[in-house]
Amino acid sequence: MNEWMKKGPLEWQDYTYKAVSVTASDKEYKGWVLTTDPVSANIVLVNFLEDGSMSVTGIMGHAVQTVEIVNEGDHSVREKLMHLFMSGDCKAYSPEDLEKRKNSLKKWLEKNHIPITEQRDSRKTLCVAGVLTIDPPYGPENCNSSNEIILSRVQDLIQGHLEASQ
């Protein structure tokens, strides 16, 4: 087993958003690490091309011989990599906007007699009746629950709130 495969997901995570040189199957690959698969140790490298496009390369974890960090990167590269695969309608919210959205949704759900609280460990996550959570930016797609009926009803309420507030 090679050195790369002996590492674990937490160690692989240290390479994320950094420029690396990877040797795999006696070939050398260079690029920015977008992610590493925690099961297979596969590496996804991104290279920004001069024409403004990018190339994405997947390297199989079992073939990796060495990985060397060549550049730690900076905040702008990290932001660019983080937003590569976000849809165009995805927008960033300021902390103030998120707080307004959270409070507005919380009032709306209370008005509709839905028991809503803020989770103790994360003041950003809303919790409905202890069985559903709503994460920022507090849209229907940000709801999580194993109870499909409650999930569907709360998502419908949130959608109605968004439509009413536009």
From Swiss-Prot:
Keyword Nucleotide-binding: no
GO biological process, one term: spliceosomal complex assembly
Location of the AD domain: 68-166
InterPro entries for the chain: AD, Gemin6, Gemin6_C, Gemin6_Sm-like_dom, Sm
Modified positions (Phosphoserine) in chain numbering: S94, S165
Self-association state and partner proteins as the record states: Part of the core SMN complex that contains SMN1, GEMIN2/SIP1, DDX20/GEMIN3, GEMIN4, GEMIN5, GEMIN6, GEMIN7, GEMIN8 and STRAP/UNRIP. Part of the SMN-Sm complex that contains SMN1, GEMIN2/SIP1, DDX20/GEMIN3, GEMIN4, GEMIN5, GEMIN6, GEMIN7, GEMIN8, STRAP/UNRIP and the Sm proteins SNRPB, SNRPD1, SNRPD2, SNRPD3, SNRPE, SNRPF and SNRPG. Interacts with GEMIN7; the interaction is direct. Interacts with GEMIN8; the interaction is direct. Interacts with SNRPB, SNRPD2, SNRPD3 and SNRPE; the interaction is direct.
Protein name (record): Gem-associated protein 6
Gene assigned in the entry: GEMIN6
